[in-house]
């Protein structure tokens, strides 16, 4: 009997220890980094710095996009996901995922851009034209620019025709007169200016500073682990940001910051942006 009890207690002890070990490892995905090799290359220095600061072990979970990431979280395959504002809204609606840390980048806003020689002066002048919005469902390339059109009194897919073109293809279409404007964020303006040095571009509308990218957490992760993650960013933010921006792929975060007091309400503005493209239920990504 004593041997049986001892064996039982030993088994319970092993299970408890296993649970603690598992809890000390967090599974981490990034929605816009495709594949494990790219994830290790772009986020490796950040991973090392975070593990050293937090005492938690990070296990990369590669995904091929936002849909795979939300499905992985639904299947309890991933704990934390770094994603954009528009994607967060869907994660929250589908899974009740919550924001833990905001990843802010400087000058994160949407614009509408035309050729400098264009007769278009305001968004209202684009009525009846085609407009390219880059990546469909993107906060800064799609929802934000559409909101600028809505603020000018133009209804999506009614007063103008939305198209979705690769950025450089969109510029070529703009030069050819096939589209009237392009929806971009600030860094994209810099990119096309460098890519097309013989062209002059003009911004006809600039949006608000958009809500930041966000590290979100699955509902089943323990509050203690969530608090450890949040505290690590709050106390070691400068070191983590330096590690993050050590790779060229994360240059967009240079000059940015981490915010450990982010709330779901901070993304209500994105929900309103979705409404501008006719979406009032947020359980599916825009495809």
Predicted regions and their residues:
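A structural signal for short loop-to-beta-strand junctions that line the ligand-binding cleft
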Residues: 96-104, 201-204
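N-terminal signal peptide c-region/cleavage motif recognized by signal peptidases
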Residues: 17-19
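An extracytoplasmic/periplasmic, membrane-proximal ligand-sensing/linker region
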Residues: 23-29, 34-45, 217-287
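Hydrophobic/proline-rich hinge and linker segments of small-molecule sensing/allosteric domains
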Residues: 101-122, 214-218
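A local structural motif
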Residues: 52-62, 77, 151-164, 198-200, ...
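Beta->alpha turn/N-cap motifs
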Residues: 30-32, 62-66, 76-89, 103, ...
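Bacterial N-terminal signal peptides that target proteins for export
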Residues: 1-9
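Pocket-lining segment of extracytoplasmic ligand-binding domains
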Residues: 118, 129-231
């Amino acid at each position: 009997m004593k041997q049986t009890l001892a064996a039982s207690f030993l088994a319970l002890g092993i299970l408890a220890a296993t649970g603690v070990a598992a809890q000390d490892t967090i599974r981490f995905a990034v929605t816009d980094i495709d594949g494990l090799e790219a994830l290790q290359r772009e986020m490796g220095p950040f991973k090392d710095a975070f593990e050293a600061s937090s005492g938690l072990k990070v296990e990369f979970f590669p995904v091929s996009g936002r849909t795979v990431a939300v499905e992985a979280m639904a299947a309890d395959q991933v704990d934390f996901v770094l994603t954009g504002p528009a994607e967060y809204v869907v994660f929250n609606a589908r899974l009740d995922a919550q924001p833990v840390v905001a990843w802010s980048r400087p000058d994160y806003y949407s614009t509408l851009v035309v050729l400098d020689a264009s007769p278009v002066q305001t968004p209202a002048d684009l009525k009846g034209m085609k407009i390219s919005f880059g990546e469909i469902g993107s906060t800064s390339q799609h929802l934000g620019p559409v909101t600028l059109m809505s603020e000018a009194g133009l209804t999506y897919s009614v007063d103008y025709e939305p198209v979705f073109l690769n950025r450089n293809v969109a510029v070529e279409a703009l030069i050819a007169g096939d589209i009237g404007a392009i929806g971009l964020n600030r860094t994209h303006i810099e990119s096309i200016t460098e890519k097309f040095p013989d062209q002059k571009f003009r911004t006809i509308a600039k949006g608000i500073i958009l809500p930041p990218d966000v590290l979100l957490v699955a509902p089943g992760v323990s509050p203690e682990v969530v608090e450890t993650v949040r505290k690590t960013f709050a106390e070691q933010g400068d070191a983590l940001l330096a590690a993050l921006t050590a790779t060229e792929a994360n240059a967009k975060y240079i000059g940015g910051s981490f915010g450990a007091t982010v709330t779901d309400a901070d993304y209500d503005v994105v929900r309103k942006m979705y409404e501008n493209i006719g979406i009032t239920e947020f359980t599916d990504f825009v495809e």
